[in-house]
Regions:
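C-terminal intrinsically disordered, low-complexity extensions immediately downstream
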Residues: 212-262, 296
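C-terminal lobe substrate-recognition/regulatory segment of protein kinase catalytic domains
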Residues: 140-184
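Conserved catalytic-loop aspartate of Hanks-type protein kinases
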Residues: 103
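Activation segment signature within eukaryotic-like protein kinase domains
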Residues: 22-23
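Conserved activation segment of eukaryotic-like protein kinases, specifically the C-terminal portion
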Residues: 76-91
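Structural motif in protein kinase domains
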Residues: 1-10
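Catalytic-loop of the protein kinase fold
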Residues: 34-51
Length: 302
């Protein structure tokens, strides 16, 4: 890939159709990632590679986490993730129970940057970042606060004084109604009210691409199982050993599958051969009788 989205946005060379295509591809990629039970946790323009055809690839999965094998009681996340400007409210507020909806907030921040050419929430600290977010989303109600699942939420929100909520239309005067609708659905303080990736792909903003390339939108057949605990910090040597052990285990599993397949093929081949031989043995006498019968008829016919 030639460059990244951060550089392209700063260059101000993207046409509206390019922005739509970039957003569609981003959602399409996240559809697969989230279906695998993976949360990227560090989505931002500099982690989206792009070429001259406006084709993108998501990179840097260094902070990605698996959430499939964890139970409801597990503390699944640390709050130190992602560049601050693209962090979801639940991450900023120290929640340890957030999910793939945190990625969707980051998508909203990226979308806003595509539309306006500059970051939406360039906070200088966690509190300042939260203040900038609430200026757009408005102060959360009790339901929204409970959805964050963090004891810090109530106190931090109460310490922020919002003079006047900013309207998206005012912030994005050139944006269309459809663009503002998608942006508003992505930038919901409450993660339960935030649009998910499947819903976003159905949104009118990317509808044309979604209809055209629907067959290429794939989901992971089954969630990715991580055999190394995400909640344990290992040394480099330990990581190497665990990865090596996992590779050996997978290699043995693949060999076993191949052996089973070969056994089935051999069994089916032998069965087929026996079937043909049995049929041939049964049919040969009938063919001989027919020939003799023809000879007899021919003889008396003279």
């Amino acid at each position: 890939m030639e460059t990244d989205l951060h550089t392209v946005i700063r260059s101000n060379i993207l046409e509206p159709i390019h922005k739509q295509f970039v957003m569609y591809q981003l959602l399409k990629a996240l559809k697969f990632i989230h279906s695998a039970g993976i949360v990227h946790r560090d989505l931002k323009p500099s982690n989206i590679l792009i070429n001259s055809d406006a084709c993108i690839k998501i990179c840097d999965f260094g902070l990605a986490r698996s959430v499939i094998s964890l139970t409801g009681k597990d503390i699944i996340m640390t709050d130190y993730v992602a560049t601050r400007w693209y962090r979801a409210p639940e991450v900023l507020l120290g929640s340890t129970k957030y999910n793939s909806q945190a990625d969707m907030w980051s998508v909203g921040c990226i979308f806003g940057e595509l539309l306006n050419g500059k970051p939406m929430f360039p906070g200088t600290s966690t509190l300042n970042q939260l203040n900038k977010i609430l200026e757009v989303t408005g102060k959360p109600n009790k339901e929204d606060i409970l959805s964050i699942q963090s004891e810090l939420t109530q106190n931090m929100v109460e310490n922020i004084n919002i003079i006047k909520q900013k309207n998206l239309k005012t912030l994005f005067p050139k944006a269309t109604a459809i663009e503002l609708d998608l942006l508003g659905r992505l930038l919901q303080f409450n993660p339960n009210k935030r649009i998910n990736v499947l819903e976003a792909l159905e949104h009118p903003y990317v509808a044309d691409f979604h209809e055209q390339y629907a067959d290429s939108e794939i989901q992971c057949e089954k969630p990715i199982q991580i055999h190394i605990s995400d909640n344990t910090k290992y040394t480099v040597k330990e990581y190497k050993q665990k990865l090596f052990d996992d590779l050996l285990k997978r290699k043995k599993e693949v060999r076993k599958k191949i052996m089973n397949m070969n056994m089935k093929i051999n069994t089916n081949t032998n069965t087929h051969k026996n079937y043909i031989n049995n049929n041939n043995n049964q049919q040969q006498p009938q063919q001989t009788l027919k020939v003799k019968k023809k000879k007899v008829i021919s003889k008396y016919g003279k």
